[in-house]
Structure formats: C-alpha cells, structure tokens
C-alpha cells in the first residue's frame, strides 16, 4: 500500500500521473498519526511505500520517516518501507545522505529502501548515477521503472503513447469480488504476494484511492472501519479509465463496470 505524504514535486516530468506541481500541498503530522493508527489497526503495515509528489520535498520528511519507523518498531514484526524518490535530495549534501543511511540501518525489524527513479527517457533533469551512494545498502537505482505509460495526469494531457492492459485499480477491485470473505488485510497481503504493492493508496488528507494517482476518485477514508472499506471497494464505480478497461475481455471487464 502507498502513503502520499505530499503532492509537491518540482521536477515537472511529462509522464506524471499525479500532475504533481511545485505548489502541491503536504500531509500534516496530525493526519500522519491517524494514518498510522489506521494502518496498524487494519494490519496492512508489512510493506509500505512512502511516495508523493516527491516525498523528500516534504519539509518534515525525516521526522515523518522516523515517526513511521517508530510506530512500526513497536510491533516487533518484519516490515518493509520503500521510499520512491528522484534522488536529488539525497545527492544535495552529505547530511541528507547520512540521514538516509541512519534510516536504512535503524532497526533490525524494519527494512528501509530508497527506490531511486533515474529513467532518462522521461526525467527532465539527469541524475548522476555514478555516485558511490547508489551502490550502498538500501539504495536501489531504477533506470527502467517506467515499464509502460499510464494515461492519467500529465501523461494524458501530453498525449503520451500508452500500453496499459487494465486500469490501476483493476487488481484490488477484482480481488475484492473473488476472495471469500475478504478483509482489507487479506486484499493487501494477497496483492503483495503477487508483487503488487501500490494499492490501495492513502492521500494527504486521509482519503483512500484504489489506483496509483491522487487524481483517482476517493473510494473510502482512513476514518472508515476496515469492513466498511472492503464493502466500498466491492461497490466502487469509476469510469475514469474506460479507454483502457473497455479493451478487456468480458470475463475481466465484469469486475470494473
């Protein structure tokens, strides 16, 4: 599952499905506290993606990370936190790099990774991928993260060619109708076992979306009970990505109409 801690990003990538801008808003600490309450109560904390926007542009990025790590450490269970980033904040100065290393080495139960996107096809600024830091523990350079363009946000505005097979929300919506007596925990865990870690996503105000973009319509809220959220996922209707789902065979399309 993903947590958006900010909608701000100064990069301006042409393919951004969030249409993130330099004036994007940030999650408040009060909301983060509620988010972690929800994540722990719902037992969906084993694999968390911290994202944005550009998460390192949140003015309290380090404090947010340490708070999340602290809450998870109390559970005494193995957890993975992945920060998706363009990497420029990390290269900005040695202090930032040391902060990241402390996070990576901070707990035996919590694995922290920085997934650094360096796909030169779409990023307007070129990251220096020769730096030694990228070969150290906890840093993963991803120069081909963008497997396919998704027609949302600036990618849609810029009419970029796309090749997606189904909407981003397809898997969790289909799974909610296939699993017997699904819970939020079973939905998230089943997706994770298949290598799908990005659904659902929690926005900066606590809203829950089923795709991977803040532009997706709200399905539920962290203030709902987990059982209510599952029912809302089952009942969810959205026609925002019909240009993709209309291509699906009927056996699959039935789950997203």
What name fits each language-model region?
Residues 34, 132, 240-243:
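Charged/polar, solvent-exposed surface patches and flexible loops
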Residues 58-192, 196:
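Conserved AdoMet/S-adenosylmethionine-binding subsite of the radical SAM
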Residues 1-83, 90-95:
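Conserved alpha-helical substructure of the radical SAM core
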